[in-house]
Amino acid sequence: MTPFPMRLSRAGLLVTAGVALSAQAAPPDQLREQVPGWFRMMVDQHEVTALYDGYIDLHTGLLKGMDQEALRDHLDALFIDTEQGVQTAVNAFLVHTGEYLVLVDAGSAACFGPTLGQVPDNLRASGYAPEEVDTLLMTHLHPDHVCGLVDGEGEPVYPNAELRASRDDADFWLSEAQAEAVPEDDRAFFDMARNAVAPYREAGRFSTFEPGEELLPGLQARDTHGHTPGHASFLFEGGDDELLVWGDVVHSYGVQFDDPSVAIEFDTDPEQAIATREAVFEGAAEDAHWVAGAHLPFPGIGHVIRDGEGYRWLPVEFGPIRDDR
């Protein structure tokens, strides 16, 4: 016969276990929040910080040059959801060269809706301040790259920076005559570009560059026009490794690496955009340099390799900043 005190002790344990199980049955609410959108790595002496601006859902009908059913089947095979459009990242890149703090592209601000506009907050979360940026380089003047130059009141987000864009893109997107020459429904992009650039221009801190120009020591502008008349990429050189920040060479990684001949509705010159993409892919695969893309899945940094008749994207692996590599 079990002694009475031991029976009480066992009963107490059962009660305690019941209370514990009851407590575990009510977990906390799901948080459903993501970590801040920044990623950092070194490319030789350059400290590169990818900044997530957010995402936009692109309808598959915007992609041209492939049958839509085949396009969706191709994306479905890669587990890329197309039901609400293809979720497409918008990235900017902050490069500390050791002498300069360079921001390539500025994100969308409020121009394309509430899923975008996170570059300034993520820049701060990464440890820098907008006031510390001294150089702003625009791959091109589409709204998802330039609207983030100004805040909601039209004031510069980067008050101490010199803003630079290619001459051909500036001559096109900042031209009132060019804006008046297009249908009224197409003028919004021109208005957004002019509004974003205006305060820098008024302050005497806007200038243009030519393809091939050395913008800073070890930083060269590359001609990658086609998507826009003056679309540019930026090659950060030095040591054994290089980084090409290529803007909108790719809009759909799930399709265009396999088939570079697929264009997008927003291309000013689709045939030239295709030729540029093929040349840039070939160069990236041949030279094995790092690539950073505005619409590649965040952080948008990696390598391009040949894969049969097409190419394949190899994204960077997350990890610590290492001095031994």
Residue ranges and their predicted role:
Residues 2-13:
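Bacterial N-terminal signal peptides that target proteins for export
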Residues 12-22:
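Bacterial N-terminal signal peptides
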Residues 27-28, 117, 124-128, 132, ...:
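Metallo-beta-lactamase
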Residues 33-126, 233-250:
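Conserved beta-strand hairpin/beta-sheet module of binuclear metal-dependent hydrolase folds
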Residues 36, 59, 141-148, 172, ...:
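Active-site environment of divalent metal-dependent phosphoester hydrolases
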Residues 53-54, 106-109, 141, 168-169, ...:
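Active-site metal-binding loops of divalent metal-dependent hydrolases
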Residues 91-92, 114-164:
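Active-site metal-binding motif and surrounding structural segment of the metallo-beta-lactamase
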